[in-house]
Amino acid sequence: MLMQNQVTKRAVGEDTMDLKLHHINLSTNNVAGMSHFYRDILGLKTETQDLPVLEKNKGYDGDVTFVSDGQIQTHLAEKDVNVGFRTGHIVNPLERGHIANRTDDLAAFKAHLKKKGVAFSDWDETAVAGWQQIFFYDPDGNVIEVHQITS
């Protein structure tokens, strides 16, 4: 089993880059209740490492709690159906939540998506300082994030 900080190179189509599951974001109108459930019922621990620095003055200032099983983070974020409108992005990762992968080469991953004809919304560092983020949809409309650490 891979630990969170271990990364394996894997082929993404014809391309190769580091890409690993980083977190799952669940959007909620009850962050405190969700935090209680995930900590007290599922036994997840409050996460204190490798956390995003939220840019609360750039369009999203909701409450977020971070928990983890020691490998994968779960971000419990206050639902915000209008954050896409306020920030000028077509994909809203805080309406229904999303799953997030981390890469070491976001430019290569964006080129890969373009080559495959997958449209994406480039948030750059709009929401998180030091994280360049893109968001796109899978075939069923689930939101996927891929980000790269920049600092």
Model-predicted regions and their roles:
Residues 70-74, 81-83, 106:
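Short, charged/polar surface micro-motifs in flexible loops or helix N-caps
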Residues 25-73:
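Core segments of cupin and vicinal oxygen chelate
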Residues 2-17, 20-30, 62-68, 86-151:
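Vicinal oxygen chelate
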Residues 51-56, 82-87, 122:
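A short, acidic/glycine-rich surface segment
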